[in-house]
UniProtKB/Swiss-Prot annotation:
This is tRNA N6-adenosine threonylcarbamoyltransferase. One of its GO terms (molecular function) is iron ion binding. It catalyses: L-threonylcarbamoyladenylate + adenosine(37) in tRNA = N(6)-L-threonylcarbamoyladenosine(37) in tRNA + AMP + H(+). Its EC number is 2.3.1.234. The keyword Transferase applies. The gene is tsaD. Transmembrane segments: none annotated.
């Protein structure tokens, strides 16, 4: 008998300021749509939760319709619904979770609440091969900076090797960009302004890289302060602004890549995955590639369009869970703004264990 295809999984992402919807089946992206409220937040220099939530309410149904249209499907073709249940902005998450439950109930299909960061880990699945098992993952975004040991993403616990003690890398980019007079969002602005400038012009500190420091723990608050103090102390400096920006960026990516490479070596794991919004940074991608090649490691980074928040990564993770035989999430699952990353799925009815 012919093998029956897996169901079409609709993924919904509303954790911050992007409204993303995508449709995936058997690891293949069928269609997607994305809407952002970034421009509405720019005047405030950061994301305003109430504005983000209202934008999700306005954009979600049109995104569902657009994703279905791009796939040539109808709502009746959807066989499961996956949604980011956390972490993120509470009101923004609530919009997505409520909509996902409504679609799942109306269509009488399974509902899967998933962890936003696990979605980032799955972002490349529709464009590449299955993820190696095990691997070391570096998640770098506006709200999170973590080094993880990842096995089977659908079944195994996710092990934290180290996290940031204060600011996340993306948060540091945004705050320093503001100090340097760059527009919001700061990460892409820093990346653009650093191109062609001297990353060795200024020796900004590399936090927690000393012999006695925790090898996998991050801290970027001190670096942020060091840049701000340098700018304040040198109002008439002859150092070009582009060199200041490039030197700051180099300090961040130097720390990120050095700690990630060390984690791979210490745990004797030959694969490194870098994901999250900061993974779109051109210097991080280049330095990671250079250092992985020198260390004999295999590097995997999603395409830039998959690094920032999107519905594709949530649909891809939902599809992986469905194909792995994971039980649906509890129907009473609520948004979990502070969800800790130790499993890909949230609100599991019966946790799926790896076969012995």
């Amino acid at each position: 008998m012919p093998v029956q295809p897996s169901p079409v999984v609709m993924g919904i992402e509303t954790s911050c300021d992007e409204t993303g919807v995508a449709l995936v089946r058997d690891g293949v992206l069928l269609g997607d749509a994305l809407s952002t409220s970034m421009d509405q937040h720019a005047r405030y220099g950061g994301v305003v939760p109430e504005i983000a939530a209202r934008a999700h309410v306005q954009a979600l149904v049109p995104c569902v319709r657009a994703a279905l249209a791009s796939a040539g499907l109808t709502a009746a073709d959807i066989g499961a619904v996956a949604v980011t249940a956390g972490p993120g902005l509470a009101t923004a998450l609530h919009v997505g979770v409520s909509a996902a439950k409504a679609y799942a109930t109306a269509l009488d299909v399974p509902f899967y609440g998933v962890h936003h960061l696990a979605g980032h880990l799955a972002a490349d699945l529709v464009d590449g091969e299955p993820l190696p098992d095990p691997l070391i993952a570096l998640i770098v975004s506006g709200g999170h900076t973590s080094l993880l040991r990842v096995g089977d993403l659908a079944r195994d616990p996710i092990v934290h090797l180290g996290d940031t003690l204060d600011d996340a890398a993306g948060e540091c980019f945004d705050k320093v960009a503001r100090v340097l007079g760059l527009p919001y969002p700061g990460g892409p602005a820093v990346d653009r302004e650093a191109v062609g400038n001297d990353p060795a012009a200024l020796a900004f500190p590399r936090p927690l890289t000393g012999r006695t420091d925790s090898p996998y723990t991050f801290s970027f608050s001190g670096l942020k302060t060091a840049v701000a103090r340098w700018v304040e102390a040198h109002p008439d400096s002859t150092v070009p602004a582009g060199d200041v920006i490039a030197s700051f960026q180099e300090a961040v990516v130097d720390v990120l890549t050095a700690k990630a490479i060390r984690a791979c070596r210490d745990h004797e794991i030959g694969d490194l995955l870098i994901v999250g919004g900061v993974a779109a940074n051109s210097r991080l991608r280049a330095l990671a590639a250079q250092r992985c090649e020198a260390a004999g490691l295999r590097l995997r980074i999603p395409a830039r369009k998959r690094c920032t928040d999107n519905g594709v990564m949530i649909a891809a993770l939902g599809d992986l869970l469905v194909r792995s035989g994971a039980a649906p999430s509890r129907p009473d699952l609520a948004a979990m703004p502070g969800a800790f990353l130790d499993q890909a799925q949230l609100g599991v009815v019966q946790p799926t264990q790896r076969a012995a």
